[in-house]
Amino acid sequence: MDQARISFFPDGLRVMIIDDDAKAVRRATATLSQLQYAVVATHSTASAGLRALSGDNVVEIQAILCDVHKVVSSGFDFRRVVESELRIPVIYLLSKMEEEDMVAGEDAEFLNHLLLTATYIVRKPLNPTVMARLWRVVAWRMYCLEERIQANVAANAGAGGEDDDDDDDVVIVEEPQVHFKVVRRTSGGSRKRQLTINVVDDGNRGSGSGGGGGGGADANPTRILQHITSNLQEFRTKHQKKDMAIERPLISSDSMFLKAILPTLKISPCNPLTLTGGIGSSSVAAEAFAGGSSSAAPLQIPVFQQQSTGNGNTVISFSNNASPMAMRAPTDNTMISFNNVSAAPVANAVISFSNISRSAAMQAPAARGQHLSGDVQQLDFPQQKLYFGPFSYQGPPPPSMHNHINLLPPTSSPVTCSMDKGKVPIIELPYGMPVDDFLVSQTTYGGAGPSIGATDAAAAAYPYTDAPSNNVATGCLMVPPMGPAFSITEPTVVAQGEGTGTGVDAGTSEKNAIVEAPNNPAPLMVLDQVAADAAMDVQEDIMFSLESLLGPDYDLLPMEDVSAPDTAAAGDAAGGSLDGEEGGMDIGWDLDLDDILVENVNDFAFLDNLAGSE
């Protein structure tokens, strides 16, 4: 017998035990060791054993002894999975079950299924005589699993061979293959990507004659090629439109006419009227325009003319006449005339400015002018800044807005915030000062600004201008507010009788300053609401009803269904029955809802007459 076992298992039978009973595992290991069965691994659950068998570090195992109750608790057929996938025989261990260990329901049905389909079942504790013949069961099961796998392979191969013999059932369709390859052109021209299409006909790949079904095979690649060509055309058209949309627009300096005419004007390079990108007098286009010579052309085109009148006015005239012409401007105004005649008509556009623009134009010296030609003279005027907004960082207002904005004088009353019932609050601020700077300035130097709901008198207590000791410009919002000043005086010691000690009395001026100091509440603070919150915090013994705490859908009190005679007896004893004669629901506790007190800590405090206390 030993020789037969050694012929099947030369290195001995290697076994895995799956059981959570440590005592049973030690006993089984000792029994199997006497029979030269090596226990190489033990696990407490079927899932852990399956994970170990499916891992990377798998030891050679020839049989698995598994407690059937561990398979029931795992929820899957451990034997079927292991034997079909790993081809390792699984033998179930069945122990004597106590009454508390009995299974029922679906677990009982699953246990019966496992026992009916089991390969071999051994009762616990293990019998050495029975385990001595275990190697025969393992060898026979391994042989059956190998034969079953070979039969399945042969069956699949036979099914495939029959299909190969029957040419009518199998239809093999060979379609031409289209290979796409993305390449980049190295030569000149467009550097866009193009598709190289290689059409290969599988039917003619083996033979070079190209015979057999040429019409049908050639039609498919043609349609594919046409389809791809149309898609490429749409792609190129779309990208051409996109490229045209993002092209650089033609600027005025690129005009050939300007490149040819600008060198003949002899304009200084620092002239602001000279366009960027113009070419010099040595240009070929300029020489062709000037008659083939690089010298100055006799054509003289005046750019603009300017004359100063005796009454302090400035006249700027744009015309096509080469000689300067005198135009009479209105009194104390500046006129800009755009016309093509020597005399200014009545309908010319007249743009009037205040004396600021006039003085800027009058102060330009004639010595700074640059001569363009014998009859044209240009004066360099100081550039005026352009202002767009009324705030301080945007500069002073333009002269045209002086008549539309009323500035508050520096010696005016401080900023006030008035609010009438039913109207939007009106805030008066000096011109050019942002509101946010005003709000920040009220708290920058430690003072509290007036609240939104403050009266006019309270807001007037925070002056921000006309402070003689501030040493800053009048009207600045960042000046610290002028609040009541307090002075520290020497305390006056007043005797309060013999042996009673001394008391400290503040000075009269300090008392008066404290009395006269306004009470500045914090902004957006409602005193009535603060007082109401403080009153609510002082209250104690807050009472709530049970319905308000539990909600309408919560049923705390258990209801008991009693019969008619029991209901009558219970009603006489406790006085709590709803309807003793007809039967109904009775409250199980001998207390009412008024006996339950809810304190402010949300804890239920019951009286001594709770259920069962009597």
Swiss-Prot record:
UniProt-listed InterPro entries: ARR-like, CheY-like_superfamily, Sig_transdc_resp-reg_receiver
- What residues bear 4-aspartylphosphate in this entry? 67
- Which molecular-function annotations from GO does this UniProt entry contain? phosphorelay response regulator activity; transcription cis-regulatory region binding
Annotated GO biological processes are: cytokinin-activated signaling pathway; regulation of DNA-templated transcription
Keyword terms of this UniProt record: Activator, Cytokinin signaling pathway, Nucleus, Phosphoprotein, Two-component regulatory system
Disruption effect?
A: Low fertility.
Stretches that traverse the bilayer: none
Q: Where are the residues of the annotated region Disordered? A: 200-220
One Gene Ontology cellular component term attached to this UniProt record is:
nucleus
Whether Repeat counts among this entry's keywords is no
Its annotated compartments are: Nucleus
Q: How is it modified after translation?
A: Two-component system major event consists of a His-to-Asp phosphorelay between a sensor histidine kinase (HK) and a response regulator (RR). In plants, the His-to-Asp phosphorelay involves an additional intermediate named Histidine-containing phosphotransfer protein (HPt). This multistep phosphorelay consists of a His-Asp-His-Asp sequential transfer of a phosphate group between first a His and an Asp of the HK protein, followed by the transfer to a conserved His of the HPt protein and finally the transfer to an Asp in the receiver domain of the RR protein.
List where Gly residues composition bias occurs: 205-217
Task: Please report the stretch or stretches of sequence annotated as the Response regulatory domain.
Answer: 14-139
Query: So what does this one do?
Result: Functions as a response regulator involved in His-to-Asp phosphorelay signal transduction system. Phosphorylation of the Asp residue in the receiver domain activates the ability of the protein to promote the transcription of target genes. May directly activate some type-A response regulators in response to cytokinins.
By sequence similarity, the record places it as follows: Belongs to the ARR family. Type-B subfamily.
Name of the protein in question = Two-component response regulator ORR33
| Organism, scientific name | Oryza sativa subsp. japonica (Rice)
Gene that encodes it: RR33
